[in-house]
């Protein structure tokens, strides 16, 4: 590289202050070559710290150009800037900016974690750096157990972890006693002698006197830039930079390392606030316990009821043409007619009967065309099927007799044809070009397996036969067995009557077994209802997780700034807080499942008719649900953390 290592050209930095902007740097041009040791001197408020932040890619110019090794920083994305900070810059802060819950060696390792270095290599280099700086016996100590000078040396070691081509020292002696300050300056000079570019930001002329180049700044402008002939060259300490940098691990290993670091930091954060963590998990625990227990109770109740009702008959029977399901001759059999339905309806064991015939036809209303199942039925159809109308009325015997052009539609058809119109009664629709007046809308019936999406229209069977289908025979007959009558006996009598009328067995019957279906549907609906109530507690728990994570982001803003300064990407920060949220939810989910098994034991003490039945699917779903809650409700806090400005984050206490 032939040009300067760092070059600013007419750089200006403004900050908004009310309706006006405050100019902190004004038209600054500056170049620094590799291997220089430079002091930037100025009073408080002169703009020297802002200049250092721009040099270290923690901040960006409002206008002008800044290049690092010939690369224009304004063209770089946030992750590319993080890579520059991680691989080229090392920061030494006046306030040290060490993470209090990590030991000295772990603080030094941090830049290498985000560089993707292998764990063993980064620990070896961290210990070597601390040893060269006289802290080998303090590697396992936390910052609170170190003196100010020792903390600053840890900060220097951290700056060198990834090589530290450029060392940026912001008032490195400002918080130290004179002896510790001299030691820090000595180390910086030794690093410069080893080839590191050292930039010292200070207001102390005595500190600046150790630099071979002094740049003076005042009111955001450079007012002096001179060489210092009185600065002595330092002798390089042979191993002051700690030896070889740790090699970057393979992509997979690097990703695993960063994830492990995120999990470890999440665990430390959770353990350090035990009560808050427990209260955060409480909503998740209650929700998971409720969902798993309710599903287990519902499954146990269903099995018990199915065992109990066993062979109980049902009250609805269908009659179809043919020998059985799939009979290829069924379409050719035309002996099932409306008179059969009338004869069945007259039997003492039958409550009601309805003929049925159906086709898929095109419906049209104004400019809306849809395909629907059009069924021709008798006036007792809705009674037989137990269907209720949400609007209007059903057609009666008179409409059936005179082939009236009237129709009853279901709710799905109403939505498709009429959209936002809540009252389609009296509207005329075309059924295969036959105009029919809508006289009723059936109420929605939800299946235990979900909402039925098909479209249904019912017209008098005489209208269907004479005006739409052009056929006299029926597709089926549905009868409802009178209450109190044995379903199997009714089926036998029905079969006998039909044989007498047809003279041969050209039909078959199907007993709907409605009791079993009703029990299953009721059990599933009840389980669903109670599960939804439990899910509400899960959502509340998730909101609690989000609130606590937002608080955690606020509390750890400075930590986020430190991590960004040493090279953490936005994705690294987001991953850390997402892992923390998911960890909370998974722990809550695990505790909830354990409590569910405990509830099973208590349940068996009070209810002996059936027992709770757990399934692997419900337990796996609980863990999946916990993970999803952690991701969904942890996303916003994690995103907020990743979008923090490094300078603003570092400035917060």
UniProtKB/Swiss-Prot annotation:
Top enzyme class: translocase
One BP term from GO: response to antibiotic
Ranges where the ABC transporter domain occurs: 6-244
GO molecular function: ATP binding; ATP hydrolysis activity; transmembrane transporter activity
EC number: 7.6.2.-
Residues annotated as binding ATP: 42-49
Entries under Gene3D superfamilies matching the protein: P-loop containing nucleotide triphosphate hydrolases
Any one of the GO CC terms: plasma membrane
General function of this protein: Non-canonical ABC transporter that contains transmembrane domains (TMD), which form a pore in the inner membrane, and an ATP-binding domain (NBD), which is responsible for energy generation. Confers resistance against macrolides.
Similarity field: Belongs to the ABC transporter superfamily. Macrolide exporter (TC 3.A.1.122) family.
Subunit and partners: Homodimer.
Annotated protein name in UniProt: Macrolide export ATP-binding/permease protein MacB
């Amino acid at each position: 590289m032939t040009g300067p290592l760092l070059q600013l050209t007419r750089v200006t930095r403004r900050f908004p202050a009310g309706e006006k902007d405050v100019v902190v740097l004004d038209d600054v041009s500056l170049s620094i070559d590799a291997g220089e040791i430079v002091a930037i001197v100025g009073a408080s408020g002169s703009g020297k710290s802002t200049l250092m932040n721009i040099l270290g890619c923690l901040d960006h110019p409002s206008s002008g150009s800044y290049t690092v090794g010939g690369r224009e920083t304004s063209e770089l994305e946030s992750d590319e800037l993080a890579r520059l900070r991680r691989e080229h810059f090392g920061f030494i802060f006046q306030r040290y900016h060490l993470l209090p819950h990590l030991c000295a060696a772990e603080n030094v390792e941090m830049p290498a974690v985000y560089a993707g270095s292998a764990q063993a290599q980064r620990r070896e280099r961290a210990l070597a750096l601390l040893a060269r700086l006289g802290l080998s016996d303090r590697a396992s100590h936390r910052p609170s157990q170190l003196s100010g000078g020792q903390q600053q040396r840890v900060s220097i070691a951290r700056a060198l972890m990834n090589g530290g081509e450029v060392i940026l020292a912001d008032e490195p002696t400002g918080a130290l006693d004179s002896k510790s300050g001299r030691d820090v300056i000595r180390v910086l000079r030794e690093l410069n002698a080893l080839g590191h570019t050292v930039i010292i930001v200070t207001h102390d002329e005595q500190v600046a006197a150790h630099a071979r180049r002094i740049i003076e700044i005042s009111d955001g402008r450079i007012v002096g830039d001179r060489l210092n002939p009185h600065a002595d060259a330092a002798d390089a300490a042979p191993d002051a930079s700690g030896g070889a940098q740790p090699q970057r691990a393979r992509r997979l290993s690097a990703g695993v390392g960063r994830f492990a670091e995120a999990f470890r930091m999440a665990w430390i954060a959770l353990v350090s606030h035990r009560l808050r963590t427990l209260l955060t998990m409480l909503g998740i625990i209650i929700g998971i316990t409720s969902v798993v227990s309710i599903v287990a109770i519902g499954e146990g109740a269903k099995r018990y009821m199915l065992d109990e009702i066993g062979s109980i008959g049902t009250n609805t029977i269908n009659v179809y043409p043919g020998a059985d399901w799939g009979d290829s001759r069924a379409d050719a059999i035309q002996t099932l007619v409306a008179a059969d339905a009338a004869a069945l309806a007259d039997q003492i064991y039958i409550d009601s009967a309805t003929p049925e015939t159906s086709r898929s036809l095109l419906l049209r209303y104004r400019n809306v065309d849809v395909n629907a199942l059009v069924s021709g039925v008798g006036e007792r159809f809705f009674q037989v099927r137990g269907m209720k109308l949400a609007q209007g009325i059903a057609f009666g015997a008179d409409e059936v007799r005179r082939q009236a052009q009237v129709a009853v539609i279901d709710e799905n058809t109403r939505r498709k044809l009429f959209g936002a119109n809540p009252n389609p009664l009296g509207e005329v629709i075309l059924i295969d070009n036959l105009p029919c007046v809508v006289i009723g809308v059936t109420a929605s019936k939800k299946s235990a397996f979900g909402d039925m999406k098909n479209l249904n229209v019912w017209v008098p069977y005489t209208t269907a036969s004479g005006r739409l289908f052009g056929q006299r025979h029926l597709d089926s007959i549905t009868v409802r067995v009178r209450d109190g009558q044995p379903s199997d006996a009714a089926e036998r009598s029905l079969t006998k009557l039909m044989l007498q009328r047809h003279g041969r067995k050209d039909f078959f019957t199907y007993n709907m077994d409605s009791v079993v279906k009703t029990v299953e549907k009721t059990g599933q609906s009840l389980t669903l209802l109670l599960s939804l109530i439990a899910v509400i507690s899960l959502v509340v728990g998730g909101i609690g997780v989000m609130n606590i994570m937002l608080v955690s982001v606020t509390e750890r803003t400075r930590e986020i700034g430190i991590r960004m300064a040493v090279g953490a990407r936005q994705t690294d920060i987001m991953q850390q807080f997402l892992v923390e949220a998911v960890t909370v939810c998974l722990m809550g989910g695990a505790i909830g499942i354990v409590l569910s098994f405990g509830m099973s034991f208590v349940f068996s003490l009070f209810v002996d008719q059936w027992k709770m039945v757990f399934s692997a699917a419900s337990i796996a779903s609980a863990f999946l649900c916990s993970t999803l809650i952690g991701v969904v409700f942890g996303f916003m806090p994690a995103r907020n953390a990743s979008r923090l400005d490094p300078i603003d984050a570092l400035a917060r206490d």
